Amino acid sequence: MIRIGHGFDVHAFGEARPLIIGGVEVPYHTGFIAHSDGDVALHALTDALLGALALGDIGKLFPDTDMQFKNIDSRILLREAFRRVQEKGYKIGNVDVTIIAQAPKMRPHIDAMRAVIAEDLQCSVEQVNVKATTTEKLGFTGRSEGITTEAVALLVKSC
């Protein structure tokens, strides 16, 4: 049996903190306004994993009203979601993440993001795709006010 999940996340820029995307620190003059580290890529991917198995969403499991998640590394959240996937008897078929940002440029960091995600999901880097695009300077992402990310996860029942 296979299951497919979709995830979405968005964060605005505005805090003096490191910019973390896909588990990688991306050099930029500002970070995200967020309760956790604000990693939009891992948040969308976490939601995709949870959605594939009807396990709710990131806000249900890790509410931003709970101080234990304040400034938490989003890799911890992703790994916990994946633990739940494994508990249900599934493994990764593949994941695909799309980062929508005018700035900063993602291309130099994509290979590192893929490696981090593959490590956390205990799969091959060939099962992880990360790509980036812009909105051609349209909307808040086009004005470099923040970043949007979408993710899809295909889960396969373990034998």
Curated annotation (Swiss-Prot):
4-CDP-2-C-methyl-D-erythritol 2-phosphate binds at residues 9-11, 35-36, 57-59, 62-66, 133-136, 140, 143. It catalyses: 4-CDP-2-C-methyl-D-erythritol 2-phosphate = 2-C-methyl-D-erythritol 2,4-cyclic diphosphate + CMP. Binds 1 divalent metal cation per subunit. One of its GO terms (molecular function) is 2-C-methyl-D-erythritol 2,4-cyclodiphosphate synthase activity. It is an enzyme of class 4 (lyase). It comes from the Bacteria. Its cofactor is a divalent metal cation. Keywords: Isoprene biosynthesis, Lyase, Metal-binding. Its EC number is 4.6.1.12. The record marks 35, 134 as: Transition state stabilizer. The keyword Metal-binding applies. GO terms for biological process: isopentenyl diphosphate biosynthetic process, methylerythritol 4-phosphate pathway; terpenoid biosynthetic process. Pfam families: YgbB. Pathway: Isoprenoid biosynthesis; isopentenyl diphosphate biosynthesis via DXP pathway; isopentenyl diphosphate from 1-deoxy-D-xylulose 5-phosphate: step 4/6. A divalent metal cation binds at residues 9, 11, 43. Involved in the biosynthesis of isopentenyl diphosphate (IPP) and dimethylallyl diphosphate (DMAPP), two major building blocks of isoprenoid compounds. Catalyzes the conversion of 4-diphosphocytidyl-2-C-methyl-D-erythritol 2-phosphate (CDP-ME2P) to 2-C-methyl-D-erythritol 2,4-cyclodiphosphate (ME-CPP) with a corresponding release of cytidine 5-monophosphate (CMP). Homotrimer. This is 2-C-methyl-D-erythritol 2,4-cyclodiphosphate synthase.
